[in-house]
UniProtKB/Swiss-Prot annotation:
The gene is queC. Zn(2+) binds at C190, C198, C201, C204. Keywords: ATP-binding, Ligase, Metal-binding, Nucleotide-binding, Queuosine biosynthesis, Zinc. PANTHER family: 7-CYANO-7-DEAZAGUANINE SYNTHASE. The keyword Ligase applies. InterPro entries: QueC (IPR018317), Rossmann-like_a/b/a_fold (IPR014729). It catalyses: 7-carboxy-7-deazaguanine + NH4(+) + ATP = 7-cyano-7-deazaguanine + ADP + phosphate + H2O + H(+). This is 7-cyano-7-deazaguanine synthase. ATP binds at I9, S10, G11, G12, M13, D14, S15, T16, L17, C18, A19.
Length: 224
């Protein structure tokens, strides 16, 4: 019986690369996407489906966690809050694009699904560089989440949360993705737009900087 990994895939560059790395390690991939009614959900869902097709994933889940929007308090789900433009977060205070405890919620649900599917690993594309001020993007948080899941699931089930990108910067991620033939043109990073990436939000800036430092051109369309 093949080993199985649950890959949390947002439709973005990091989580997609993680799924490709899982496949390279010989895992049968079960793909998981969360719909929390963020601004670019339809685009992200479309990317998720295309990525699953490219990976030849046979089993995937799209789970409705729209209660995250009801909690609010962030610019990704609340359109009355402006998304910051042309500035990267450099403080230890979470930016307004931080969705409170999002990765904690995602991993709790992923733990349940991983137990049901008997997955030995969960792959999640957290990156500490992206998570300046994001308390749920650190290696320390992930280790505690793994302990929490293993403590709260059946005794004959143990899962390892794998974060192969957590210490990498965006340039290294771009380089690795292209080396592994990851179709980055199928991925989406923009926080605000679904047709053409804005090129100005925190996520777009990190992506563009990564491509520039790696010496490659991003193939997705930008407004600016």
């Amino acid at each position: 019986m093949s080993k199985k990994a649950l890959c949390i895939i947002s439709g973005g560059m990091d989580s997609t690369l993680c799924a490709y790395l899982a496949k390279k390690e010989g895992y049968e991939i079960i793909a998981l996407h969360f719909d929390y009614e963020q601004r670019t959900q339809e685009k992200e869902k479309e990317c998720f489906k295309q990525i699953c097709k490219a990976l030849k994933v046979e089993k995937s889940y799209i789970l409705d966690v729209s209660f995250i929007k009801d909690i609010g308090g962030n610019a990704l789900t609340d359109k009355s809050i402006d998304i910051p433009k042309n500035e990267l977060c450099t403080s230890d205070t979470p930016p307004i694009t931080y969705v409170p405890f999002r990765n904690g919620i995602f991993l709790s649900i992923a733990g349940s699904l991983a137990e049901k599917e008997n997955c030995e690993s969960i792959f999640i594309g957290v990156v500490e560089e992206d998570g300046s001020g994001y308390p749920d993007c650190t290696d320390e948080f992930i280790q505690k989440a793994q302990e929490f899941i293993n403590e709260g699931t059946s005794k004959n089930f143990k899962v390892c949360i794998k974060t192969p990108l957590v210490r990498l910067n965006k340039a290294k991620i771009v380089e690795l993705a292209l080396k592994e033939n990851v179709p980055l043109e199928l991925t989406w990073s923009c926080y605000e737009s679904e047709d053409e990436a804005c090129g100005e939000c925190d996520s777009c800036l990190l992506r563009l900087r990564g491509f520039e430092k790696a010496g490659f051109k991003d193939k997705i369309k930008y407004k600016s």
